[in-house]
A protein has these predicted regions:
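PP2C/PPM-type serine/threonine phosphatase catalytic domain
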Residues: 1-224
Length: 224
């Protein structure tokens, strides 16, 4: 939960070949409700889907979006709530993913850490425009402003992709409680020096606390 927040607005689920992370936002417990709704709806949708492919991951997030938008329409006090979502599934030799918001998917391969998802955030737009550097994203005053989130509008575009993977690849999903405080280079360094994924988690969470732990943090690490 971190050192500052009183509520944990992060949620996740892990099954045999699918995992997801959500990070909610909004007042009156809205963030907690949105992230819980999203992860539950995504999990239920995918568990009832006979074939998992890139389209079904996108559809799962869109399904969650509709459910949250409808909930907000019924309860005005929840207006403004929403959540990030990143969903990953391993199918054969491919990693399928879908994403909205600034929760991230990384892959670590051959001692290189690559961010697969693109943040839907104000600071990402500034980075793309060449106005700030990757390092400046972490300390920018607008780093928490999202340009896209699940549950905010009926029309939602979900990023998605398919990535070939091989034995030994490591994947990392996280909320901005990690990526908003710890640099990509530090994450790469930890993965380089530590083979045990549980120890990786413990080390990164310790780093977050050393950096102030101003947000909830959720991290999933796995090896193909």
């Amino acid at each position: 939960i971190g050192l500052v927040r009183k509520q944990n607005e992060d949620r996740f689920f892990i099954s045999d070949n699918i995992c997801a992370v959500t990070d909610g936002m909004g007042g009156y417990r809205g963030g907690e409700i949105a992230s819980t709704y999203a992860v539950d709806e995504i999990k239920e949708y995918l568990q009832s889907t006979p074939t998992i492919n890139e389209t079904s991951l996108v559809d799962a997030i869109l399904h969650a979006n509709t459910r949250i938008v409808n909930r907000v329409a019924r309860e005005e006090r929840l207006s403004g709530m929403g959540t990030t979502a990143v969903v990953v599934a391993k199918v054969d030799d491919n990693l399928l993913w879908a994403s909205v918001g600034d929760s991230r998917l990384y892959i670590y391969r051959n001692d290189e850490l690559t961010q697969i998802t693109t943040d839907h955030s104000m600071v990402q737009q500034l980075l793309d425009a060449g106005e700030i550097t990757k390092e400046e994203m972490i300390v920018h005053p607008q780093r928490n402003l999202l340009t896209r989130a699940v549950g905010v509008e009926e029309d939602l575009h979900v990023d998605s992709g398919t990535l070939p993977v091989k034995s030994g690849d490591r994947i990392l999903l996280c909320t901005d409680g990690l990526s908003g405080y710890i640099s990509d280079e530090r994450i790469r360094e930890v993965l380089h020096h530590i083979d045990d994924n549980t120890e990786v988690l413990n080390t990164l969470i310790a780093d977050v606390y050393d950096a102030g732990a101003g947000d909830n943090v959720t991290i999933i690490v796995g090896t193909i």
